[in-house]
């Protein structure tokens, strides 16, 4: 009797864990579909990082103090990189 009860509880636990994992995968797949614009935003973020650091490097090569380029739209230039404020 105990073995049967343990087997039933084990199966129930596995079923719950499997269902939870399936729900997480479904949620992740929906986020990936909705998150496609985020990859475009990440590309913009990378461009901002690159743009700011390149402008500072060019100014340093000219033996001038590096004037930090002003990043717009909630971004600021810090350590030669645009960071979100």
UniProtKB/Swiss-Prot annotation:
Keywords of the record: Disulfide bond, Neurotoxin, Postsynaptic neurotoxin, Secreted, Signal, Toxin
Signal peptide: 1-22
Subcellular location: Secreted
Tissue: Expressed by the venom gland.
GO cellular component: extracellular region; host cell postsynaptic membrane
SS bond list: 52-66, 56-77, 71-82
Superkingdom of source: Eukaryota
PROSITE patterns: HWTX_2
Propeptide feature: residues: 23-48
InterPro entries: Hwtx-2-like
GO molecular function: toxin activity
SUPFAM superfamilies: omega toxin-like
Subunit structure: Monomer.
Family membership: Belongs to the neurotoxin 12 (Hwtx-2) family. 02 (Hwtx-2) subfamily.
Protein's job: Neurotoxin active on both insects and mammals.
Protein name: U4-theraphotoxin-Hhn1a
């Amino acid at each position: 009797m105990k073995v049967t009860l343990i087997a039933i509880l084990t199966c129930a636990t596995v079923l719950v864990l499997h269902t939870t994992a399936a729900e997480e995968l479904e949620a992740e797949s929906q986020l990936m579909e909705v998150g496609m614009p985020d990859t475009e935003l990440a590309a913009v973020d990378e461009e901002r990082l690159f743009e700011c650091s390149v402008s500072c490097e060019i100014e340093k090569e000219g033996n001038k103090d590096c004037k930090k380029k002003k990043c717009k739209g909630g971004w600021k230039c810090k350590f030669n990189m645009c960071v979100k404020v």
